[in-house]
């Protein structure tokens, strides 16, 4: 692990904030525990891509936009990650995902499904989803580390694989050697290798699909 503190106004208050530290550590502890190498960059909050690019411009990695959506009934949730310079309107998204009418998920749903607030949506939030899979009756497997299921989960909200979230990923990320996401808080960015990202998805164990986004 490599940690770098970037210049920025008021950066110290974010580094010293215990809640921010806990959210970030939840991700970095998981990566370290599972042998996924990463670089951690601390910076002021980056709530928009425009602001983020000011800090990302000198970091060698593919940086991403991340959306969290729900279906019309509100019983299915979708995470979408794609290269940050691309634009994707909701009608195009509905066509590509083939999941019916979609809308942006509320902050309450973000917290429940990914453990994040608006502006910090990230695939690393799928750690929150790891403890939702329902084991077979005779299974003695322990729940994954660092899982904190906040409330009971209705079976109707789960996909067939026992997870609440389906993940759609920009297929161009397959070609990226290094990929950057927030570690569940927008005061930091984590860079992992393509192989590390794929290993993370395997550990998550949910359903993901590569999609073309122009």
Model-derived regions, located:
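Extended, low-hydrophobicity, polar/charged segments
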Residues: 1-214
């Amino acid at each position: 692990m490599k940690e770098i503190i970037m210049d920025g106004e008021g950066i110290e208050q974010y580094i010293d904030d215990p809640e921010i530290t806990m959210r970030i550590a939840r991700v970095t502890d998981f990566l370290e525990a599972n042998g996924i190498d990463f670089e951690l960059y601390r910076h002021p909050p980056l709530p928009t891509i425009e602001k983020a690019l000011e800090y990302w411009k000198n970091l060698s990695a593919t940086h991403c936009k991340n959306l969290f959506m729900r279906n019309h009934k509100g019983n299915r949730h979708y995470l979408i990650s794609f290269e940050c310079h691309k634009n994707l309107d909701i009608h195009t998204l509905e066509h590509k995902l083939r999941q019916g009418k979609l809308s942006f998920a509320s902050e309450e749903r973000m917290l429940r499904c990914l453990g994040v607030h608006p502006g910090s949506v990230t695939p690393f939030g799928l750690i929150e989803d790891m403890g939702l899979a329902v084991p077979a009756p005779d299974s003695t497997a322990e729940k994954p580390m660092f899982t904190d299921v906040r409330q009971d989960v209705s079976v109707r909200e789960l996909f067939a694989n026992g997870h609440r979230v389906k993940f759609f990923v920009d297929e161009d990320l397959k070609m990226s050697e290094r990929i950057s996401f927030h570690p569940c808080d927008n005061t930091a960015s984590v860079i992992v290798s393509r192989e590390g990202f794929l290993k993370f998805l395997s550990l998550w164990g949910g359903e993901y699909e590569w999609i073309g986004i122009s």
